[in-house]
Amino acid sequence: MSYITKQDKVIAEAIEREFQRQNSNIELIASENFVSEAVMEAQGSVLTNKYAEGYPGRRYYGGCEFVDVTESIAIDRAKALFGAEHVNVQPHSGSQANMAVYLVALEMGDTVLGMNLSHGGHLTHGAPVNFSGKFYNFVEYGVDKDTERINYDEVRKLALEHKPKLIVAGASAYSRTIDFKKFKEIADEVNAKLMVDMAHIAGLVAAGLHPNPVEYADFVTTTTHKTLRGPRGGMILCKEEYKKDIDKTIFPGIQGGPLEHVIAAKAVAFGEALENNFKTYQQQVVKNAKVLAEALINEGFRIVSGGTDNHLVAVDVKGSIGLTGKEAEETLDSVGITCNKNTIPFDQEKPFVTSGIRLGTPAATTRGFDEKAFEEVAKIISLALKNSKDEEKLQQAKERVAKLTAEYPLYQ
């Protein structure tokens, strides 16, 4: 950071302090990860200087011959990773990727079936405060009250009743395998298109550890960070028949110049995901999540749906020990464990309070945490949350966090 330090000491200090926070804390936010130095280097490259409206070989600016190379490589690698017919790597975020699909598949006011946010869905799947809920008529499906898993019979019933033009599958806080084949069958039955938002599970899909939605969906959207371990950004995968509509909706429809430095970083991350050790990493992510869930159950915590099939563990802290999600998040943060409060199915608390917390294993697994480390993480979580007013116990938890993070340093 020598250049930043010379130019802007205040920003340099903030960046350095953020690095120290990441290095000294255990990161359990399920949507976060640590990218490689190669990904960061690509994102901080001279490509940030280049305007490149359009697509490879069809630009509105001169001098795009090299960004054409990096963007084409990103597209080809994404196709190889997921077996997609067409890929657009230009969306700046997952939300913009979702917006583009809606603009292609729907007219304003059309009916869409999407997962309830408090049951594990996402803001862009029809939340009233989001553009999706304002522009379209979203009908919500959720999970079964007893199993806390998606009730496909209920999804089918709602689809038959409301005849949606589009069905959205995918979630931001759902810890079980999603049956895309069933969603496709339901969509076909009511003559709806199927969109899958695989933002949270894209890395698992790439590694073959979760069913691939590309086989079933008309459109698949994703972020490129989270389990995919790339830069913050979005991507759309679709059938060849939708290529022109998707591309013109991204540009010039909702975006101008693409972020070619970010696209180059996406290409680097996709290249990493094509390597054999990426599958090993994803296998460890899932192993660690299962160990974390089981260890917390042994400590007396109720896990939503009773466990996990992926990278994510949803914990009912209110029902387990009487703390709200907000209180649990703040307590864990005080000892060096970063997570987020999260609504759980049929939550009675407000969204900014919640009854649950969402935990994820991708970031800590990138640091090298294994099953034994996550057993210790569960014990530290239990110690802190069960003694949230006991400064001595909280100090013990903090010291145990420091010992773990020292054992698995970041970017060393």
Swiss-Prot record:
SUPFAM superfamilies tied to this protein: PLP-dependent transferases (SSF53383)
From the UniProt record, give the pathway where this protein acts. One-carbon metabolism; tetrahydrofolate interconversion; Amino-acid biosynthesis; glycine biosynthesis; glycine from L-serine: step 1/1
List its EC numbers: 2.1.2.1
Task: Give me any GO biological process, just one.
Answer: tetrahydrofolate interconversion
List the subcellular locations. Cytoplasm
Keywords assigned by UniProt?
Amino-acid biosynthesis, Cytoplasm, One-carbon metabolism, Pyridoxal phosphate, Transferase
- Return the PANTHER family for the record: SERINE HYDROXYMETHYLTRANSFERASE (PTHR11680), SERINE HYDROXYMETHYLTRANSFERASE 1 (PTHR11680:SF35)
Q: How does it assemble?
A: Homodimer.
* Protein's job: Catalyzes the reversible interconversion of serine and glycine with tetrahydrofolate (THF) serving as the one-carbon carrier. This reaction serves as the major source of one-carbon groups required for the biosynthesis of purines, thymidylate, methionine, and other important biomolecules. Also exhibits THF-independent aldolase activity toward beta-hydroxyamino acids, producing glycine and aldehydes, via a retro-aldol mechanism.
What protein name applies here?
Answer: Serine hydroxymethyltransferase
UniProt organism field: Staphylococcus aureus (strain COL)
